[in-house]
């Protein structure tokens, strides 16, 4: 299994368990699905003998419904105005460029060339995006984007390809 980590925050952003493709040589696009993760209480952990109780009260099951990628990776939703996002992406791109210059110099030109098309995709559809940081909520780290396919039911997420490092398990 391969885990993809943000180069700035070190947060695990996703794994190779999801359907993934490269988009514009700038993003990894992952297709997700809406799921519910149960967060109920394990009655065996409470103790006592339920059959000996006079009145048995049922415990409500709780859960989290959302995109399976967001839930599994514990991504945290955040908000941006268009102006705030432009400031963020400029700063984040500088960090990625520094990382590439030091660690993957062969990707510097590709990153620069793909940036314009990638940002055009994001800004042209800005009102539809939801934004997610890694679990640590590091404001300097990667902010992944989520939208829905034309069917309105299938979520997909974009992660900055050059802002990730692979770790094999």
UniProtKB/Swiss-Prot annotation:
Belongs to the TCTP family. It is found in: Cytoplasm. Involved in calcium binding and microtubule stabilization. GO terms for molecular function: calcium ion binding. Its main location: cytoplasm. It comes from Branchiostoma belcheri. Residues 1-169 form the TCTP domain. This is Translationally-controlled tumor protein homolog. One of its GO terms (cellular component) is cytoplasm. Keywords: Calcium, Cytoplasm. Gene3D superfamilies: Metal Binding Protein, Guanine Nucleotide Exchange Factor, Chain A.
């Amino acid at each position: 299994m391969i885990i993809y980590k943000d180069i700035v925050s070190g947060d695990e952003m996703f794994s190779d368990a999801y359907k993934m493709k490269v988009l514009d040589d700038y993003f990894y696009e992952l297709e997700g699905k809406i799921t519910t993760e149960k967060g109920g209480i394990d009655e065996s952990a409470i103790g006592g003998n339920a059959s000996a109780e006079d009145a048995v009260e049922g415990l409500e099951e709780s859960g989290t419904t959302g995109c399976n990628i967001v839930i599994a990776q514990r991504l945290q939703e955040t908000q941006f105005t268009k102006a705030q996002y432009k400031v963020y992406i400029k700063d984040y791109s500088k960090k990625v460029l520094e990382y590439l210059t030091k660690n993957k110099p062969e990707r510097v030109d590709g990153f620069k060339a793909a940036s314009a098309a990638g940002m055009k995709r994001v800004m042209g559809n800005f009102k539809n995006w939801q934004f997610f940081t890694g679990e640590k909520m590091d404001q300097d780290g990667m902010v992944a984007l989520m939208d829905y396919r034309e069917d309105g039911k299938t979520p997909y997420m974009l992660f900055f390809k050059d802002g990730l490092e692979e770790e094999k398990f």
